[in-house]
């Protein structure tokens, strides 16, 4: 089975709302902690200032952040000025039983400068498509003041309870130890709901490891599509993803926080780098490698049920809807470039597996 992994949740829902959290300015105030904590919070604030603007400035800044890919006009902003940089993420040409086709790409929701300009195979797929299909379009939400205000409210407990009352002592202790590697004290997070704590830690990890959600593949393509006037199709929605994240049970977050036991900042960064390396080479199976008995040591039967529930909600239930959306688009003969998180394509119950079971053929695109 697959236990709960922080890096897995990072690149499905949580990473997609990193920009939302940053634009809220709601990384916890660590003024009560040591200087390292202050430095971590300052880093987040600085990054927010660099990447969060308003109106037209927001779109231009996002594209310009990717080297050699700034938008100069409304024509095709994903240029042919590509380079051989060893980036070959998994991409497929999918054909329906009726003969309609679609190009599907596995994305990574936060990337580094080295990934840009994009490989020619990706730029061609984008430029040749009439529609860009993505998990959700967060570009307008980041500029919606009312939405952001409501999001901030949902990050905090409003019933006079605190974090320590919603998770076990074991989870609290593991989280406290892990926060120490960031120079933070758990007392700074007591007023935050588990989803906000989890997403804040993801944000800090992304930034400390020199990744940038503004340079994430789907965010880059979204920004470009808006500049080009290309039609955007949301497979899910911002509300759907936020509600999923917010409504996970305390039991799921308790197990998630307990998984920090024995982890350090460096070990989490290495896990992130390992997934990034796998993504760059098109190795999607690494995203869903099964855990061995040693790695599952300490998991009770109840823990395994909780992990299964999490993985079903986070991946497999969504995969079914994503595959259906792809089938619907192909049945209409739409010319679509379909881009969702790489983990959604992997293994049994992944998008490719589901499509093949429905009679579709999937051929890996060679770079």
Task: Describe the residue ranges of each PLM region.
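A cross-kingdom marker for long, charged
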Residues: 303-367
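Sec-dependent N-terminal signal peptides of Gram-positive bacterial secreted proteins and lipoproteins
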Residues: 3-28
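Bacterial lipoprotein signal-peptidase II cleavage site
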Residues: 22-33, 37-49
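Phosphate-group recognition and catalysis centered on beta-loop-alpha active-site segments
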Residues: 31-32, 38, 63-67, 71-76, ...
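Extracellular/periplasmic catalytic domains that process cell-envelope and extracellular macromolecules
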Residues: 85, 96-97, 330-332
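A generic local structural motif
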Residues: 2-4, 89-90, 118-120, 323-324
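Structured, acidic catalytic/metal-binding patches in enzyme active sites
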Residues: 79-80, 90-310, 314
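N-terminal low-complexity, Pro/Thr/Ser-rich intrinsically disordered segments
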Residues: 52-94
């Amino acid at each position: 089975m697959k236990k709960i992994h922080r890096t897995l949740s990072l690149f499905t829902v949580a990473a997609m709302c990193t920009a939302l959290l940053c634009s809220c300015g709601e990384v916890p105030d660590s003024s009560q902690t040591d200087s390292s904590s202050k430095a971590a919070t300052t880093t987040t604030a600085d990054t927010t200032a660099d990447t969060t603007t308003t109106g037209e400035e927001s779109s231009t800044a996002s594209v310009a952040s990717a080297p050699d890919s700034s938008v100069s006009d409304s024509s095709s902003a994903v240029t042919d000025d590509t380079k051989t940089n060893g980036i070959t993420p998994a991409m497929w040409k999918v054909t329906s039983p009726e003969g309609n086709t679609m190009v599907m790409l596995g994305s990574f929701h936060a990337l580094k400068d080295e990934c840009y300009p994009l490989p020619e195979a990706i730029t061609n797929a984008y430029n040749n498509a009439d529609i860009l299909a993505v998990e959700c379009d967060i570009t307008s939400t980041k500029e919606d003041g009312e939405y952001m205000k409501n999001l901030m409210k949902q990050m905090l407990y409003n019933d006079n309870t605190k974090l320590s009352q919603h998770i076990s002592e074991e989870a609290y202790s593991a989280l406290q130890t892990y926060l120490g590697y960031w120079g933070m004290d758990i007392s700074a997070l007591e007023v935050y709901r588990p989803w906000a704590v989890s997403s804040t830690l993801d944000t800090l990890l992304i930034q400390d490891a020199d990744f940038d959600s503004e340079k994430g593949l789907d965010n880059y393509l979204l920004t470009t599509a808006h500049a080009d006037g290309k039609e955007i199709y949301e497979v899910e929605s911002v509300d759907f993803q936020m509600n999923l994240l917010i409504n996970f049970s305390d039991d799921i977050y308790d197990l998630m926080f307990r998984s920090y036991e024995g982890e350090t900042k460096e070990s989490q960064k290495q896990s992130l780098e390992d997934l990034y390396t796998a993504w760059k080479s098109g190795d999607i199976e690494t995203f869903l490698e099964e855990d061995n008995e040693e790695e599952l040591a300490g998991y009770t039967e109840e823990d395994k049920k909780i992990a299964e529930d999490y993985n079903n909600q986070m991946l497999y239930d969504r995969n079914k809807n994503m595959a259906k959306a792809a089938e619907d688009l192909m049945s209409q003969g739409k010319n679509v470039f379909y881009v969702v998180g790489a983990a959604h394509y992997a293994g049994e119950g992944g998008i490719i597996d589901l499509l093949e079971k429905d009679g579709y053929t999937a051929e890996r695109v060679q770079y």
